[in-house]
Amino acid sequence: MMRILLFLATNLAVVLIASITLSLFGFNGFMAANGVDLNLNQLLIFCAVFGFAGSLFSLFISKWMAKMSTSTQIITQPRTRHEQWLLHTVEQLSREAGIKMPEVGIFPAYEANAFATGWNKNDALVAVSQGLLERFSPDEVKAVLAHEIGHVANGDMVTLALIQGVVNTFVMFFARIIGNFVDKVIFKNEEGQGIAYYVATIFAELVLGILASAIVMWFSRKREYRADEAGARLAGTNAMIGALQRLRSEQGLPVHMPDTLNAFGINGGIKQGLARMFMSHPPLEERIEALRRRG
């Protein structure tokens, strides 16, 4: 909770600085001179409230959504040797990482994958696919679990949700400025907000949203390297490298992880060209090389 409060305070400061900067550069005067009667401070606050509300709401229901979207079965009483080993391993890794034991689950998927989610590092969920448990060695599974525990311990779910809230705020803010400018200045509409405002705002939100996604995914890729480092500390560098190499050998298999969980899975799939800007994970080769350099 402290992380959320500090981040919200930081971003309130960012919003205030943005508002002051626009005023200093005479943006309000420019808009008014062109017939746009727009209170930028009120607009910025409005966008911040709605931008963060959606992001934080998604964060708080993330565990429930993850269970529903992946059909994850939570292990409360282990029924098999695999389930018992899984609970014991997660408990051990959590203790070493200094966090409370998360919920542990298995989701039905042939692909080798895993994810972590939850609004709080002491109230999280870690789940692995049936395929990963069946085909990976115990050391490889432990390394994957250590990576996911690393996400939880680093507070990555909260951090990315708040970053998403920031970009949501500015996408909404600038899209509405563009919409007003097009409506009032280009189309000379003097009677409320015309159709040009709505069309321009929607189009601007789409374009700015795509650009904002690239920013969020850049942060996500950075968090993956940190989770790999945490996995290497908890399970051993060789085991972490071995798990990533094993994942690389299965890259041809389709990934069925919901988009909302991709950023916190171990395997993010493959993209080429400009599409790499929108990858939630760095290429496995680069992650392996980073661990080798780390030693």
UniProtKB/Swiss-Prot annotation:
Subcellular location per the Swiss-Prot or TrEMBL entry: Cell inner membrane
GO biological processes: proteolysis
Lineage: superkingdom: Bacteria
EC number(s) given by UniProt: 3.4.24.-
Keyword RNA-binding: no
Membrane topology label: Multi-pass membrane protein
Cofactor(s) required, per the database record: Zn(2+)
Record's keyword terms, sorted: Cell inner membrane, Cell membrane, Hydrolase, Membrane, Metal-binding, Metalloprotease, Protease, Stress response, Transmembrane, Transmembrane helix, Zinc
Transmembrane segments: 4-24, 42-62, 158-178, 199-219
Binding site for Zn(2+): 147, 151, 224
Annotated catalytic residues: 148
Top EC class for this record: hydrolase
Cofactor detail note: Binds 1 zinc ion per subunit.
N-terminal signal peptide: none
Record GO terms (molecular function): metalloendopeptidase activity; zinc ion binding
CDD domains the UniProt entry points to: M48B_HtpX_like
Record's GO cellular component terms: plasma membrane
Pfam annotation, one family: Peptidase_M48
PANTHER family, per the entry: PROTEASE HTPX
Record family assignment: Belongs to the peptidase M48B family.
Alphabetical list of NCBIfam families matching this protein: PRK05457.1
Cited HAMAP family: Pept_M48_protease_HtpX (MF_00188)
Name recorded for this polypeptide: Protease HtpX
Organism: Pseudomonas fluorescens (strain ATCC BAA-477 / NRRL B-23932 / Pf-5)
